[in-house]
Amino acid sequence: LHGSSAASDVYKRQGVCGLITPWNWPVNQITAKVGPALAAGCTMVLKPSEIAPLNAILFAEVMEEAGTPPGVFNLVNGDGPTVGVALSSHPDIDMMSFTGSTRAGISVAQESAVTVKRVTQELGGKSANIILEDADFEKAIARDTFGMCMNTGQSCNAPTRMLVPASRMAEAAEIARAAAEQIAVGDPNDEDTKVGPLVSEVQFNKVQALIQKGIDEGATLETGGVGRPDGLDKGYFVKPTVFSNVSNDMTI
């Protein structure tokens, strides 16, 4: 307090929120955005990934059955260049919450800037695990190799890079190779399967190209490689793949 002046915080709802969710963890990402928005008293328009729309449709049915008032939760299916841009640029949307690729995130930020929306984003990246000299290498590296393949490697927090002391790199590579070769790839309905297919042909081709790029740029292929696993002649299945001797100037 200074004389007759006072400072105060006022908490109020943001208004109408535009929510764009990815395909890799659809139900998780929908609830992570819708729940807080509802709790804060906001209305919302959800645009799920066009690759994984069914989860959002089921979620919308649950919301209706739960008695959500009309107009509070709204679902619009479509792709990013049409529905995503329409939401981000719409003058009646007060806030955008986006999870997905950096490329699409840039578009959301640019379109939202025209109407000075509040924007929150979680964008894709490469997660690195730093394994120090005194760590239990057998346990840590095997765990992280399995973790990298969880959800078919389609997670923003998948430990796709392991940074280890140079003196123990060969040991680490051998542990990772052995762990990767134990991972069963196949039909997700089979209880013995640990890794299913990638989500789409686009992702399959992208991953195959990255594996080939790693080979072409001189990384050491410890196991896996291009092509489908043995016994799988169709579908978007990828071999669990481990590279060593990877430098920062390589694409992978």
Protein language model features and the residues they cover:
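Single conserved hydrophobic/aromatic residue that forms the stacking wall/gate
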Residues: 1-7, 11
